[in-house]
Amino acid sequence: MKRNHRNALLLVTLSACLGLPAEAADRMRAGQWEGTWTGGGRTRATSECVTQAQADAMNGDAGAVRAHLEKIIPAAICKVTNIKVSAGQIDYTSVCAGKENAITTIYHGDRFESTDSGGARSEAKRVGACK
């Protein structure tokens, strides 16, 4: 069960970090993003193509961010709540396997860093067009 919880938390964190472009000038742009996720004593390499459609879907307010997350993260795995969107930051809460986790992601154009209340960290940078 603990491993499933970690995997669910990883899915939520990566999905949020790699798929939440909003206000493109201040946040992520479409393209290939590579980085690392560290949590539970492990570090994993991450790589994801953020499509223009994903970027466009997330260029909105908290409601648009919520709609995108609910589309890519099955409710059976985690529930996403308390989404707050500002120019260069997204904060939200996820509940996975009954455990609440607060996540903060700060965007710097072509890079970001994210932390959560469970101790996980992730960071990534845009490395170019999608592969």
Roles of regions detected by a PLM:
Residues 117-131:
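Edge beta-strand at a domain terminus
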Residues 28-43:
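Tryptophan-anchored aromatic micro-motifs
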Residues 18-24:
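Sec/Tat signal peptide C-region and signal peptidase I cleavage site
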Residues 11-12, 22:
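Cleavable N-terminal signal peptides
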Residues 104-105, 111-120:
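Short, exposed beta-strand-loop hairpins at the edges of beta-sheets
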Residues 2-10:
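Bacterial N-terminal signal peptides that target proteins for export
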Residues 44-104:
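Central antiparallel beta-sheet cores of small beta-barrel/beta-sandwich binding domains
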Residues 34-37, 91-97, 113-117:
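Short beta-strand segments that buttress and anchor functional surface loops
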